[in-house]
Amino acid sequence: MAEAGARRPFFRRRKTCPFTGTNAPKIDYKDSKLLMRYVSERGKIVPSRITAVSAKKQRELARAIKRARFLGLLPYVIR
């Protein structure tokens, strides 16, 4: 069968959405600390393929970030 020195191939575990499930944080435009985790160092919204956020929650997140920017809670551009 398998040799003694043979290794299993590496399979990356599929990440789950951090906003679904029990005791998951609610997406709120006033929670700037949470929203800053999903904004890059240049101020752009990080895509869901990197953050593993589901499509529905990514839309909610983008809407909350844009609302927080409009109200002055988050910067548009970080220098």
Curated annotation (Swiss-Prot):
Keyword field: Ribonucleoprotein, Ribosomal protein, RNA-binding, rRNA-binding
Listed GO MF terms: small ribosomal subunit rRNA binding; structural constituent of ribosome
Pfam family, any one: Ribosomal_S18
Gene3D superfamilies xrefs: Ribosomal protein S18
InterPro entries: Ribosomal_bS18, Ribosomal_bS18_CS, Ribosomal_bS18_sf
GO term, biological process aspect, one: translation
Family matches, as SUPFAM superfamilies: Ribosomal protein S18 (SSF46911)
Superkingdom as given in the UniProt entry: Bacteria
GO cellular component labels: cytosolic small ribosomal subunit
UniProt-listed PROSITE patterns: RIBOSOMAL_S18
NCBIfam families: S18
Function: Binds as a heterodimer with protein bS6 to the central domain of the 16S rRNA, where it helps stabilize the platform of the 30S subunit.
Family: Belongs to the bacterial ribosomal protein bS18 family.
Subunit structure: Part of the 30S ribosomal subunit. Forms a tight heterodimer with protein bS6.
UniProt protein name: Small ribosomal subunit protein bS18
Species of origin: Rhodopseudomonas palustris (strain BisB5)
Name of the encoding gene: rpsR
